[in-house]
Amino acid sequence: MQVNDLGFIATILFVLVPTVFLLILYIQTNKTAS
């Protein structure tokens, strides 16, 4: 299966960005709650 670099980077960003966003949101709520 041939995957071009742009598609590979786009896939990584598509997964990574929401994960980091949720992680920051989770940490912020934990700091506020405690």
UniProtKB/Swiss-Prot annotation:
InterPro entries referenced in this protein's UniProt entry, alphabetically: PSII_PsbM (IPR007826), PSII_PsbM_sf (IPR037269)
Chief location of this protein within or outside the cell: membrane
GO CC annotation terms, alphabetical: photosystem II; plasma membrane-derived thylakoid membrane
Keyword terms: Membrane, Photosynthesis, Photosystem II, Reaction center, Thylakoid, Transmembrane, Transmembrane helix
Topological type in the membrane: Single-pass membrane protein
Record carries keyword DNA-binding: no
Record bears the keyword Endoplasmic reticulum: no
Residue stretches spanning the membrane: 7-27
Compartments it resides in: Cellular thylakoid membrane
SUPFAM superfamilies assigned to the protein according to its UniProt record, in alphabetical order: Photosystem II reaction center protein M, PsbM
Biological processes per GO annotation: photosynthesis, light reaction
Function: One of the components of the core complex of photosystem II (PSII). PSII is a light-driven water:plastoquinone oxidoreductase that uses light energy to abstract electrons from H(2)O, generating O(2) and a proton gradient subsequently used for ATP formation. It consists of a core antenna complex that captures photons, and an electron transfer chain that converts photonic excitation into a charge separation. This subunit is found at the monomer-monomer interface.
Family to which this protein belongs: Belongs to the PsbM family.
Subunit architecture: PSII is composed of 1 copy each of membrane proteins PsbA, PsbB, PsbC, PsbD, PsbE, PsbF, PsbH, PsbI, PsbJ, PsbK, PsbL, PsbM, PsbT, PsbX, PsbY, PsbZ, Psb30/Ycf12, peripheral proteins PsbO, CyanoQ (PsbQ), PsbU, PsbV and a large number of cofactors. It forms dimeric complexes.
Listed name of the protein: Photosystem II reaction center protein M
Gene coding for it: psbM
